[in-house]
Amino acid sequence: MQMMLMFLLLLAAIMVIRATSPYYGALATAWLALLAALLLLDADIIFPAIILMLIYLGGMLVVFIYSTAYAADLMPLPINLTMSALMASFGVMLITMISSPSIETLCETKPWLVYDMQPSYMLFDIYQRGSSMFIVAVMILTALLFSILEVVSHRQTTMKWFIHSTY
């Protein structure tokens, strides 16, 4: 199993190096992260595998999407940074005001759980509680990555059609 994962890891690294477009680079990097995490999981190194997968997918979401959108935008428009910062601040304040009472009541009414003081039980409990959140986070990041790539690719095609039709 490890030999097959190492071979596929090498193949994914070659795919990243030889990517002909940012889309294939993003896909190859996603496979590289997944295979590296599986190789670490096969060696019973659980926490770095989880962190590796989340960092790779989150980093790809930021770097590849930004570079693809920047390369695909034929006529970049300036962004009103002041309005964006004000709207973001307003959204954070609104979410904080709405969620504060619910978090406070949840923490006050929920009985505290008693843990065994053995470290193995505590680590098992942390992993058991966090595994579903990790799976949800990976699915959301992957869906977001490919949906934004799809939107950017259609935008590029639309912009090319618009520019060629005006001449």
UniProtKB/Swiss-Prot annotation:
Q: Which residues cross the membrane?
A: 21-41, 45-65, 78-98, 132-152
- What does UniProt give as the signal peptide span? none
Question: What main location does UniProt list?
Answer: mitochondrion
Q: What is this protein called?
A: NADH-ubiquinone oxidoreductase chain 6
What does UniProt give as GO cellular component? Answer: mitochondrial membrane; mitochondrion
Q: Can you state which reaction this protein catalyses?
A: a ubiquinone + NADH + 5 H(+)(in) = a ubiquinol + NAD(+) + 4 H(+)(out)
Concerning its family, UniProt says: Belongs to the complex I subunit 6 family.
